[in-house]
Amino acid sequence: TAISAATAGTDYVAPGTATTFTAAQTFNGSSSVLAAVFANAAETTTIAATAATGTINYDVTTQSVIYYTSNASANWTVNFRASSGTSLDTAMATGQSVTVVFLVTQGTTAYYNNAITIDGTSVTPKYQGGTAPTAGNASSIDAYSYTIVKTGSAAFTVFASQTQFK
């Protein structure tokens, strides 16, 4: 048969074998069957002894979560992009979404994410509860969650929230 003549790792992924994919994989389900089921999964987190300030480039192709462990030192802008060399507009198709989280450590003086850009272009997010945050939460960790939906060519809707953890 074709499968018995195939080579594991070259012609197919052998069960129980760790495999790294470097290109997008498409799994098509149907109207009655899900395309993919995960018993467990891990997301890549970048942990950095960095303070939130200025413009922070968030490369969504290399991390799902960023955790800044030093106290924020000023309000900041998050610029979402695929990577330093690829725009998010290029990496995503219309109708696709990506969800990422930015964890920010706050000291006794708290700051907040006061602007969002995608590929350097300003975007006005829709915040949970309808109101954008106007401050951070002192002596805690603020978790900013962003769901970015591509709605057209260079057009995005961002759903955002800020949650305090102590």
Where does each model-flagged region fall?
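Residue-level detector of beta-strand structural context in well-folded domains
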Residues: 17, 23, 54-56, 114, ...
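Acidic, glycine/polar-enriched metal-coordinating patches/loops
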Residues: 5, 71-166
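Flexible, charged surface loops at secondary-structure boundaries
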Residues: 14, 59-61, 92-95
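Residues that act as N-cap/strand-start positions at coil-to-secondary-structure junctions
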Residues: 19, 50-52, 140
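Fibrous stalk/shaft segments of extracellular and virion attachment machinery
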Residues: 1-41
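Glycine-centered loop/turn motifs
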Residues: 9, 53, 95-97
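Extracellular beta-solenoid/beta-roll
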Residues: 29-69
